[in-house]
Amino acid sequence: MGKLLSFAIPCYNSAEYMEHCINTVIAGGEEVEVIIVDDGSTKDNTYEIAKRYEKEYPNIVKAVHQENGGHGEAVNTGLKYATGKFFKVVDSDDWVDAKSYKRMLATLRSFDEGKEPDMVIANYVYEKVGAKRKKVIHYENVFPVEQMFTWNDIDIGKFKVDQYILMHTVVYRTKLLKDCGLSLPKHTFYVDNIFVFEPLPYVKNLYYVNTNFYRYFIGREDQSVNESVMISRIDQQLSVNKRMIDSFLEEDPGNVNCRKYMINYLRIMMEVSSIFLIVSGTKEHLQKKKDLWKYAKDKDEKLYRKLRYSLLGWSVNIPTGLGRWISKKGYKIANNIIGFN
C-alpha cells in the first residue's frame, strides 16, 4: 500500500529542536513517510539524530545527508524521495498539532482515487516566544469549507493582508509538484514563497480544512524572518522577488482568479522587500528598492502598474522622507498586529 502523505523536514544544525518536530509527524504512523534531510550540518549531530529515527521507524522515516545546498535544495531532495500521494514541508523548528493532524489524515484519506485536490489548505498558528496570545491564520471567510472548489469559487478581494497561502498552509499533491518541474534555488533563503507560488497555475482543484494544523515557531535570534536577519539577507529576498516575476510572466495561469491572486501575492512580496529596504535606510538599500521596481517595469509595464498602483505600492514609492516614515510606521503596526518576527 502506498504512502498517503510525505513530509520533508529540512534540517541544518537542528539538533536542539528537531526531535520535537519529528515526533509530531511520525505520530501519523505507517500511512506517512518522513524524509529528514540533513543539509550538511557542521555544528551538531543532526544527521545522527535523523539516522536514529530511521533505525527506530524504518517503515516511516528516511534519513538523507547532502552537501549544504540551503533550505530550497533540502526541499528539492525531500520531493525527489517522496512517494506519498501528498507532500508537506515542515521546518525543523516547527511542528504539527496532534488533533488537527488526525483530522488532516482523515481528510486526505477520504478522497477518491484520481479525484484528489491539487492543493489542500489548513490553518496555521504563530507560536511566538513571549506573545500573550497566539495568532491563528484561518481562511473560512475566503474558501468554501470541507468541500472541493476551484479558483472560480473564490472572491480574491476577501483575502486579508495576513491571509495569503504560505508554505505553512499548504499540502500539495505530490505528482503535481513533480510534473510542473518545481526546483527551488540553492543557497537562497525565502524560497518557501517560490514553493507556494510557482505551482499555482497548475492548481485546478482545492480543498480547505478549517483546522489549526501547522505550528509556526518564531523566536530564534538567527531565524530568517527576524528583522535584522532579513535586512542582512535582503539580496536573497530580492532574488526571490525577481524569480517570481519571471515565473509569473512565463507561465500564464489561464484562470482569471488565479492570475489575480498571483498578482496580489507578488504585490505583497514587492512591498515587504521595499519596506525592509526602507527600514534599513542606507543609500545602497534605497537604490536597491528603486532597482527592484525598475526590474518589474522593464519586464512588463502592465504588470508593473498593477503592482505599483495600490495603496501600499504607492506608499513604499513616495520619494521623500515622509514616504519612508509612512512605510516604517505601517511596518510597525503590521508587525504588532500579525507578529511575524
Model-derived features: where do they sit?
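Cell-envelope/extracellular polymer assembly enzymes that use nucleotide-activated donors
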Residues: 3-6, 33, 194
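Short, well-formed alpha-helical segments that are part of the catalytic scaffolds
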Residues: 13-27
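A conserved acidic beta->alpha catalytic loop
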Residues: 38-48, 70
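Glycine-rich, basic loop-to-helix element that forms the pyrophosphate-binding segment
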Residues: 66-82
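Short aromatic/hydrophobic "clamp" motif used to bind/position activated sugar donors
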Residues: 87
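Membrane-interface aromatic/basic loop that binds lipid-linked glycans or pyrophosphate carriers
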Residues: 279-341
